[in-house]
């Protein structure tokens, strides 16, 4: 992937959603909602404060995160659908 996010942006790949419910019902792709979880593939250097100091991001590559359904901008890179969003749009990091 030749994509490097700027400032406080991150690049996220959505995680695959279960295609079957707990009771065994198979959900077709057309009816399935896009998952609101993903894995961070790249992070920007951070955001500068008013004094010009660079504040690094709290998230890192490999983190599994939760974000809003409409957060970020979807882009296609090398056939993969990725999301570019600001760190502020990330709601939580999923602890392993």
Curated annotation (Swiss-Prot):
Q: Where is the protein situated, by its record's location annotation?
A: Cytoplasm
Which keywords appear in this protein's UniProt record, sorted alphabetically? Chaperone, Cytoplasm
**Residues of the signal sequence?**
none
Give an example GO cellular component term for this record. cytoplasm
Molecular function via GO: ATP binding; metal ion binding; protein folding chaperone; protein-folding chaperone binding; unfolded protein binding
Give the domain of life: Bacteria
Q: Which InterPro entries match?
A: Chaperonin_GroES, Chaperonin_GroES_sf, Chaprnonin_Cpn10_CS, GroES-like_sf
- What CDD domains does its record include? cpn10
Q: Cite the Gene3D superfamilies for this sequence.
A: GroES chaperonin
Q: Tell me, in one coarse class, where this protein mainly resides.
A: cytoplasm
Q: Name one GO biological process term.
A: chaperone cofactor-dependent protein refolding
Question: What does this protein do, in the record's words?
Answer: Together with the chaperonin GroEL, plays an essential role in assisting protein folding. The GroEL-GroES system forms a nano-cage that allows encapsulation of the non-native substrate proteins and provides a physical environment optimized to promote and accelerate protein folding. GroES binds to the apical surface of the GroEL ring, thereby capping the opening of the GroEL channel.
What do we know about how this protein assembles, alone or with others?
A: Heptamer of 7 subunits arranged in a ring. Interacts with the chaperonin GroEL.
Q: Which family does it belong to?
A: Belongs to the GroES chaperonin family.
Q: Which NCBIfam families does this UniProt record tie to the protein?
A: PRK00364.1-2, PRK00364.1-5, PRK00364.2-2, PRK00364.2-4
**Which HAMAP family does the entry mention?**
CH10
The identity of this protein, by name, is Co-chaperonin GroES
């Amino acid at each position: 992937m030749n994509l490097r996010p700027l400032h406080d942006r991150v690049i996220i790949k959505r995680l695959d959603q279960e295609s079957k419910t707990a009771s065994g019902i198979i959900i077709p792709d057309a009816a399935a909602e896009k998952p609101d979880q993903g894995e961070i593939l790249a992070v920007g250097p951070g955001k500068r404060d008013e004094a010009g100091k660079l504040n690094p991001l709290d998230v890192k590559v490999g983190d599994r995160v939760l974000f809003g359904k409409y957060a970020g901008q979807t882009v296609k890179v090398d056939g993969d659908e990725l999301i570019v969003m600001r760190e502020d749009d990330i709601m939580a990091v999923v602890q392993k």
